[in-house]
Amino acid sequence: NYCVAKRCRPGGRQCCSGKPCACVGKVCKCPRDNS
């Protein structure tokens, strides 16, 4: 699963849950931790 966060910043830092994520256009996506 991937959580999606808006306001993507260069480097994709702390976009989702304070974890590194990939920037796709103006949206950033990062893996979600299911524990």
From Swiss-Prot:
Recorded protein name is Toxin CSTX-19
Key words, A-Z = Disulfide bond, Knottin, Secreted, Toxin
Q: Which modifications occur after translation, per UniProt? A: Contains 4 disulfide bonds.
Localization per record: Secreted
Its taxonomic path starts at: Eukaryota, Metazoa, Ecdysozoa, Arthropoda, Chelicerata
Where primarily located?
A: secreted
Molecular function per GO:
toxin activity
Quick one: a GO cellular component term?
Answer: extracellular region
**Which organism was this protein described from?**
Cupiennius salei (American wandering spider)
> Among its keywords, does the record have Transmembrane helix?
no
